[in-house]
């Protein structure tokens, strides 16, 4: 009981000034947006095409060693070893490389059995449709949230927090070199749903419930929401560690886990700082 009172007192002190609550995630969102604009996003072979090579190893090498060798010799970082099974290796190139140069880079390490260019799984038109789908998802989500709360300010706060969450996740992809792929797009779509869940949890507890003070209601929502987020982050961290150190060929899973970890961490900031700060300001003005 004593610890709970201490937490409530701490939250009371923090909520006395709601501006820093809004400013911190807002600043991180702007930085993430600048990262995407100026640093850009790498596109995976799924989206831009490339080449696949089937190799036979002449000596034992690890996946990391082979990738490092090819990147150094060919002068490009867009190379991925998809699988190593005994002496058989499959390598993915982000661009259609000159097969002679690839063969020279592999001299003494492996020989090329087959080499073929591959087209993108999704065309630019299909990707544009995905972007439109994300936009419409936000639109319909906005309408649904407005119907639930019947008030534009809490509804806009939920949408703003969800949008900031996605922007920070995409900024993290740019910062850590996680490529935009079918897997990462799927992870972003999952984040939209998760972010809205925690935002609606907070907004419902603070606005709909009448028992307790605003801060006590916020604390109750925070206990549930942060517990959910920590559990999800822990499971994604376990998946990431397993795929990186135990199953390095499962790069798709590690990319999904990395995007979700970044997004879930961002969701803690956008929900429990930004959204809570906006709601605190709104209730203060309304009263």
From Swiss-Prot:
It is found in: Cell membrane. GO terms for cellular component: plasma membrane. This is Protein-export membrane protein SecF. It comes from Methanothermobacter thermautotrophicus (strain ATCC 29096 / DSM 1053 / JCM 10044 / NBRC 100330 / Delta H) (Methanobacterium thermoautotrophicum). It holds the Pfam family SecD_SecF_C. The lineage of its organism: Archaea, Methanobacteriati, Methanobacteriota, Methanomada group, Methanobacteria. Disulfide bonds: none annotated. HAMAP family: SecF_A. The keyword Membrane applies.
